[in-house]
């Protein structure tokens, strides 16, 4: 069957005439709730899909709502198609295949109505929905657990070191340059070395976040045997910081990553610290605290395209607590990460 056989598409409309912050009905765009309204277009159990912009982010809405003019409402014919079954189909369908522009991603009603969908008997649909609902519930619980663990670590940082902006423990303050043994940026133009069966990894900015380095979606690479590769190959305990785009994302190289063999790209800088004074994990969390983020914002070298140079990195200032305390915090982080 096609979408045209089993659902209707409700066009969104401009919300200006109905918008009211105290309105009864939510206003949905392709990214989620944008406000509230006094009227609605779509009934409960409708799937929202972007007409422009975010076209691959279906949303299931279980209450009446107003959809804006950049979002479609997919209304299932409930006698043959369960709304939640339609939602899960949309979650797994790549709407980018129907994109009609090369600039802002866009979908047309005509193209959507031609999508083919397998529609089994209602009892089979219900069984599929029940299984997927349970899976999504478990995923949501896990995500909440991970969030709570991250909040626990951030709270522990404040407990141990105090607010880094006010420095209540009067720890000495120094520039990062005083404790750097090695500093370099990553390689550019290495696309030719990126291969699916590569024996090592190429770390990009997407892998570096929240003081960790994720090996998920790591780019395999066969690095060249030259000075450039030797310079950009990471070692255990190296601190990585993003220096373009989303400034100040940090991660610490683990033994697993170092043993596998990994290199950084041009959007990252690699810092090898004097570990007799600074624990890299402590520095990572300090730099991702408000005290660190404010420095990255103030040192941004461009109003158009975010960027940091080596002088900016060297001049970053931080509190230097006793190393024993830093190590205790790093051990707490490691123990918490085992629960993830």
PLM feature spans:
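Sequence-specific dsDNA recognition surfaces
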Residues: 4-44, 61-62, 66-69, 174-193, ...
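Short, ligand-facing micro-motifs at secondary-structure edges
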Residues: 14-17, 34-66, 83-85, 94-100, ...
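Ligand-binding loop in jelly-roll beta-barrel domains
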Residues: 78-82, 273-278
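Extended Lys/Arg-rich polyanion-binding regions
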Residues: 74
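A short glycine-rich beta-alpha junction/loop motif
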Residues: 2, 66-71, 103-123, 260-269, ...
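A structural connector/turn signal
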Residues: 102, 223, 228-229, 258, ...
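Non-catalytic DNA-recognition/assembly elements of restriction-modification systems
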Residues: 1-29, 114-130, 141-187, 315, ...
């Amino acid at each position: 069957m096609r979408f045209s056989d089993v659902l209707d598409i409700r066009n969104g409309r401009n919300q200006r005439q109905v918008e009211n912050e105290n309105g009864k009905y939510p206003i949905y765009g392709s990214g989620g709730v944008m406000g509230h309204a006094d009227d609605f277009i779509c009934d409960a159990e409708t799937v929202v899909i972007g007409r422009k912009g975010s076209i691959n982010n279906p949303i299931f809405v279980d209450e009446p709502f107003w959809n804006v003019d950049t979002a479609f409402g997919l209304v299932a014919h409930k006698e043959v198609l369960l709304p939640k079954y339609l939602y899960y189909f949309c979650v797994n369908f790549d709407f980018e295949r129907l994109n009609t522009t090369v600039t802002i991603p866009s979908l047309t009603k005509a193209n959507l109505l031609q999508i083919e969908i397998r529609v089994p008997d209602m009892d089979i649909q219900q069984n599929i929905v029940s299984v997927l609902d349970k899976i999504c519930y478990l995923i949501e619980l896990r995500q909440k657990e991970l969030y709570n663990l991250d909040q626990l670590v951030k709270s522990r940082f404040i407990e141990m070191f105090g607010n880094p902006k006010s420095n209540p423990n009067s720890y000495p303050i120094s520039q990062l340059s005083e404790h750097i043994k090695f500093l370099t940026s990553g390689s550019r133009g290495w696309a030719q070395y990126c291969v699916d069966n590569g024996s090592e990894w190429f770390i990009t900015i997407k892998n570096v976040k929240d003081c960790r380095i994720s090996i998920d979606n790591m780019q395999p690479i066969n690095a060249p045997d030259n000075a450039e590769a030797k310079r950009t190959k990471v070692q255990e305990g190296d601190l990585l910081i993003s220096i373009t785009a989303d400034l100040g994302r940090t991660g610490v190289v683990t033994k697993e990553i170092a043993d596998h063999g990994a290199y950084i790209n041009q959007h990252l800088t690699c810092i090898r610290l004097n570990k007799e004074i600074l624990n890299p994990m402590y520095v990572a969390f300090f730099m991702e605290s408000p005290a660190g983020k404010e420095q990255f914002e103030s040192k941004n070298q461009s109003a158009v395209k975010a960027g940091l140079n080596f002088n900016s990195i060297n001049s970053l200032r931080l509190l230097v607590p006793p190393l024993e305390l830093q190590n205790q915090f790093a051990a707490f982080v490691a123990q918490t990460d085992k629960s993830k």
